[in-house]
Amino acid sequence: MASKKMTKSYFDVLGICCTSEVPLIENILNSMDGVKEFSVIVPSRTVIVVHDTLILSQFQIVKALNQAQLEANVRVTGETNFKNKWPSPFAVVSGILLLLSFFKYLYSPFRWLAVAAVVAGIYPILAKAVASLARFRIDINILVVVTVGATIGMQDYTEAAVVVFLFTIAEWLQSRASYKASAVMQSLMSLAPQKAVIAETGEEVEVDELKTNTVIAVKAGETIPIDGVVVDGNCEVDEKTLTGEAFPVPKLKDSTVWAGTINLNGYITVNTTALAEDCVVAKMAKLVEEAQNSKTETQRFIDKCSKYYTPAIILISICFVAIPFALKVHNLKHWVHLALVVLVSACPCGLILSTPVATFCALTKAATSGLLIKGADYLETLAKIKIVAFDKTGTITRGEFIVMDFQSLSEDISLQSLLYWVSSTESKSSHPMAAAVVDYARSVSVEPKPEAVEDYQNFPGEGIYGKIDGKEVYIGNKRIASRAGCLSVPDIDVDTKGGKTIGYVYVGETLAGVFNLSDACRSGVAQAMKELKSLGIKIAMLTGDNHAAAMHAQEQLGNAMDIVRAELLPEDKSEIIKQLKREEGPTAMVGDGLNDAPALATADIGISMGVSGSALATETGNIILMSNDIRRIPQAIKLAKRAKRKVVENVVISITMKGAILALAFAGHPLIWAAVLADVGTCLLVILNSMLLLSDKHKTGNKCYRESSSSSVLIAEKLEGDAAGDMEAGLLPKISDKHCKPGCCGTKTQEKAMKPAKASSDHSHSGCCETKQKDNVTVVKKSCCAEPVDLGHGHDSGCCGDKSQQPHQHEVQVQQSCHNKPSGLDSGCCGGKSQQPHQHELQQSCHDKPSGLDIGTGPKHEGSSTLVNLEGDAKEELKVLVNGFCSSPADLAITSLKVKSDSHCKSNCSSRERCHHGSNCCRSYAKESCSHDHHHTRAHGVGTLKEIVIE
């Protein structure tokens, strides 16, 4: 069997005006050997061909397309190289000659320059007309040639020249507009670079040649070429182009990175987990291509009508000449002019483009916002949605469970043994609850052994089963009891407050254990619900969790749900979706897991959580949410409604323009040049109107990135987001404050970190362990105040709300030392020695009372961050950069952090500042009333951090 080498090639085909050229391209490509499949995307004037390069080259395809005068050229590596930046020489020369012909009023021989203008500009139109006739097709080029010929025959040379010039220049403008409309999508499809660097050798290779489990290197500023897992190093990654995430995402060892995202800082090595063609960005591009090539119901209707429109108009125009000629009317020239106006109006390009261009722009906007809509029909249906149903776990809630309590109910089974059986069985499940149980087991020194589990089974909506050490173990909700052979679940005193999820463990037919898990709602969910309500859309929650957990989520969201159904099996969800479709109308279902797949498939629109969701959910969903921010859902519905309005506007523009020209002609003013201008001008207006979908209706501030520093810097940053303080969605609240600087207070601009204070002169060990020297470290507190105020010693200032006293930046020093015998710590600080910083004190001036901050325990890698919980609602993120501390920065561990305060606080916090920083803004900043070192603190008002002592 002959070998094959299949390649996907992209071609820019500027000769595509509307869908009427698609059959021509199909006939050309179908007649060529080596073509496996192809698609034609009319709005972007793109042809995508999968072909065998051993049989058919790209240049052979270009040659075949250009024989039909389609102006095709190869697009290199999926990028758009627009070649018509300027009008063609034919149009330029024709325009100059036409302009000179108007001097005929001064010197009559100049009128012949109009004929020269026709000759100069007609060639490309004539060539396309001949190519169309050769294939027995009637298009706008043939109609224009006939019109120009008839006009010259009537000695209207100037009008003929105007027709030729307007047609050529308008086509150029249309191609420019089409390029602008498709440029965003082309950049999306060419996100991933074509080359990668092998970490071990430094060799640069083609991405297509990379195999899985190859370790590659990615430097700061480079685009990650392929999906993988970080092996070494850490960095921040800009995932905006892929997920719509507004802020950089920190990546540490074992973090997943995606092709097409940008490494903003740091050096990482990545172990590849997919081939180039199987990367998320490649699948994303394929889905977008398929969606662009699909048609809405409206578009199919218009295309069907256009098949009859052109022949009917041509027949009418012939009648306008034939009937007056047969009747020998005295003003035959008027009727010929009228017939030519009608003839030029026979091309319905503007009407045909009205739907696909608007759809194309909407799909492009969605894709660049982290929403993949798999087809044009789904976009049209999305605009009609009346009710949205949500799964709870992993969709409304984070799906990041924590085991709060685990009990053994059998005297014959120890807690250690039960936890071993449960965690070993759960380690074979992909459910987020399973991961929480496994983590809990390891935290109490129980190591699961999944290889010891036999006959593992999953029961969707109920639980799992596995056989281990001869024991049959069932784990799940109440329904799992029937699988274990029990008819009912005994009443057990289990804490279900706070919406905890209860899990039951059966060993054989005996209820051997019970555990509860806690989960929390995602940030932004309440906002998403509010926006859906404002659109007149009802909301339902369908969950397999217990009623208590479901109602707790309902309470957290302010009773936003119109319908709440709990303890549902997958088939129950599907039946409820059918019921909602009958009673409410078009229904959307949002889910992320295996249990949601039937409901996603049943709904009119299935929306799956893409990158985080299961593979099956992603395949089942009609729309893929690339991030976990469900605020994208109301955005998608708004976009679909805007696209629907644009389609209506485009149709109205097309019909109105044609109707106006015909009405003018029948009123006694048959202007042929106006008819041509209306035809090509309508196409241009339709494209420009549709491009408004690509613009952001609500402008946001510029995104800014934290500057990395080679020195040891600790950044304490205020998190302003949802009430939960969650930065996961990457979107800050839109707060308008006249005292705020541009980009602050809810926008995305951050201030630059200050330079570190002068460090110790001895850097042999950076002040760590063996020498016990101290390093100076700068802490920068970011704020949203209008202007820095440098006050002298002993001066007090108010919060940000004060007119003249605004916190700006905070500089403190961190002292680090190592103890020879740290209490309760196993790992050393540097070089593996048993010297570990184990306690930190934060002295914060101007607090009435000490505020406890819990930042968790465990190693803090360079570049890692942790959430600091203040008293009340406020939260802060502590960013750790420890380049200068240890040769092995991963050994630096933070075990506790205490806040000290003095009694100088004169609370003067304004309500606006409390809005920014929680229930008490003095927890974020303190009043300045303390002495300084050689440099003043340029951050006054609410809370100057004074000293962090690492002992």
Swiss-Prot record:
Ranges in the topological domain labelled Extracellular: 106-108, 157, 328-335, 668-671
Basic and acidic residues composition-biased segments: 841-851
Q: Which residues participate in Mg(2+) binding?
A: 592, 596
Annotated transmembrane regions: 84-105, 109-128, 136-156, 158-178, 305-327, 336-353, 648-667, 672-691
Listed under catalytic activity are: Zn(2+)(in) + ATP + H2O = Zn(2+)(out) + ADP + phosphate + H(+); Cd(2+)(in) + ATP + H2O = Cd(2+)(out) + ADP + phosphate + H(+)
Q: What is this protein called?
A: Cadmium/zinc-transporting ATPase HMA2
The GO terms describing molecular function are: ATP binding; ATP hydrolysis activity; metal ion binding; P-type cadmium transporter activity; P-type zinc transporter activity
Keyword Isomerase carried by entry: no
- Function comment: Plays an important role in zinc transport and homeostasis. Could also be involved in cadmium detoxification.
| Chain positions covered by the region annotation Disordered | 841-866
Stated family: Belongs to the cation transport ATPase (P-type) (TC 3.A.3) family. Type IB subfamily.
Tissue localization of expression is:
Predominantly expressed in the vascular tissues of roots, stems, and leaves. Also detected in developing anthers.
**EC number(s) stated in the UniProt entry for this protein:** 7.2.2.12, 7.2.2.21
What gene name is listed for this protein? HMA2
List the ranges whose topology is Cytoplasmic.
1-83, 129-135, 179-304, 354-647, 692-951
Instruction: Tell me how this protein sits in the membrane.
Output: Multi-pass membrane protein
Pfam families per record: E1-E2_ATPase, Hydrolase
One cellular-component annotation, GO: plasma membrane
